[in-house]
Amino acid sequence: MGTWTREELEREFDLYKARGAAGDWSAWADQFTEDATYVEHVYGVFEGREAIRAWIVKTMSTFPGNEMPLFPVEWHIVDEERGWIVAKIWNRMQDPGDGSVHQAYNFSLLKYAGNGLWSYEEDIYNPASFADMIKAYMAVKGK
């Protein structure tokens, strides 16, 4: 058995999802340890909670992040031995006005550090899929 129970890992992942849904990205960054690492394959590697906060607040307050309010989780796996969560998360744009859905997915690896904090996140995705999704969204929205 690992350091944390499945129940604790599930509870903290539920909070992680709720914080993302709330859209308060500064508060969202508070769920990481002070020395956390965040690996984002397009934007780079962020070391420390404050670096994560600066990046996520900027990214989610400018296009396209500011029009991407929904992050439904299709599935997730709990690795109790390691304290890890692996999830398939959709990044969904707001309704462009015609009811169409524009989204692309990533796989996220989260490593739990205890006390309600994550020490690591890595988002793995195909940037070309995101670019195609954004182009289709903009075509419908008329940007």
Placement of each model-derived feature along the sequence:
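A short local loop/turn or secondary-structure capping micro-motif enriched for an aromatic residue
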Residues: 47, 94-96, 127-131
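Short solvent-exposed loop/turn micro-motifs enriched in small/polar/acidic residues
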Residues: 11, 68-70, 102-104
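Short beta-strand edge/turn micro-motifs at domain boundaries
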Residues: 105-136
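A solvent-exposed, acidic/Ser-Thr-rich amphipathic alpha-helical stretch
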Residues: 6-7, 25-83
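Short, low-complexity N-terminal intrinsically disordered segments enriched in polar/charged residues
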Residues: 1-30, 34, 139-143
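Hydrophobic pocket/interface hotspot
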Residues: 16, 28-29, 36, 48, ...
